[in-house]
């Protein structure tokens, strides 16, 4: 949520900044509504003040045994007016709040302006894109012999886009997750296994609704709806909603492992088959609450963790600064870590590290008290640390051998009983 006071003070500047994300944004309707709401409040306060004066006059008239019928009639008229004002005020405030809730976060000044991902800027590359002395296979082709993933059986039970891991695929997935969690803990992140369902107001607080309403799986629990989380960011942000934290306790750096649920899987087209885009996947998510002064230090810490993981896995990757048209609704700055997928012949995002400023904190009402006792909204940051499906794809495709086997990265072997290679089923 943005600060309405800044919008009132600098409407043209705010509109210009927002249009870098969405050129269609106009603040005219919002400003008109804000003016109407403030006028209604002023008129209501004036009527309340007048009623107070009249009530005093009625009291004096009664004490003096004077006729107060006209005064009483005027007070009754004011009461009716106040009821009408309150109804109108509630309606107008609801419209204003909805418009405010649909405005995205302002992008930082150093974010490239572009309507889409074509404006993203590669700011760092690491490792060489592999060349193979044989025709490299897509991970789905490798899986035909390895048999570590199954798409047919879960399609019967659940539908397309819901893969199942099997055999050594289960071990490799858990090896990855254990390695990722150990890495987060080593860097000082507090580990969590949070709930997978959240209330609607928690989705609102993290910025998922109202803009993306209807894109999340919902579970009915009596008269209450709960939502399956699209990322642990949602629930971690909600942990401290409507709280006042102490400045000396910041930053709070959390890392959570959860399954994540996305309804839009498959939107990338048939070429993104397999694990590249699915409805359910595992992810380790980093999340932090900071002061504005701590924000950049924690941001660099998150970037460092992601780069360390990809470097230790010896995967070729690049860092891309996202343009305004490719950033999320809540982010003011995002850097994507992208790994090379030989099967796609392209770099694919495995982690997004974002600064959100006080945008989520305003929606969630999360503040901190400084040493002087003054209250401020916290800043929030989030970063994938990391999502495993594409990471698994990257390992399978970059570590593949001519015979269809796949070498297991050395950092994962301790979590797989020191197994060094995945062999095709026919040679086991």
From Swiss-Prot:
Query: Could you mention a single GO BP entry for this protein?
Result: selenocysteine biosynthetic process
Q: Which InterPro entries match?
A: aa-tRNA-synt_IIb, aa-tRNA-synth_II, aa-tRNA-synth_II/BPL/LPL, Ser-tRNA-ligase_type_1, Ser-tRNA-synth_1_N, SerRS_1_N_sf, SerRS_core, tRNA-bd_arm
Q: Which residues bind L-serine?
A: 231-233, 285, 384
Record field: catalytic activity: tRNA(Ser) + L-serine + ATP = L-seryl-tRNA(Ser) + AMP + diphosphate + H(+); tRNA(Sec) + L-serine + ATP = L-seryl-tRNA(Sec) + AMP + diphosphate + H(+)
Pathway annotation from the record: Aminoacyl-tRNA biosynthesis; selenocysteinyl-tRNA(Sec) biosynthesis; L-seryl-tRNA(Sec) from L-serine and tRNA(Sec): step 1/1
E.C. number: 6.1.1.11
Q: Name one GO molecular function term.
A: ATP binding
| NCBIfam families, per database record | serS
Question: What does the function comment of this entry state?
Answer: Catalyzes the attachment of serine to tRNA(Ser). Is also able to aminoacylate tRNA(Sec) with serine, to form the misacylated tRNA L-seryl-tRNA(Sec), which will be further converted into selenocysteinyl-tRNA(Sec).
The family this protein is said to belong to: Belongs to the class-II aminoacyl-tRNA synthetase family. Type-1 seryl-tRNA synthetase subfamily.
Q: What is this protein called?
A: Serine--tRNA ligase
What gene name is given for the protein in this entry? serS
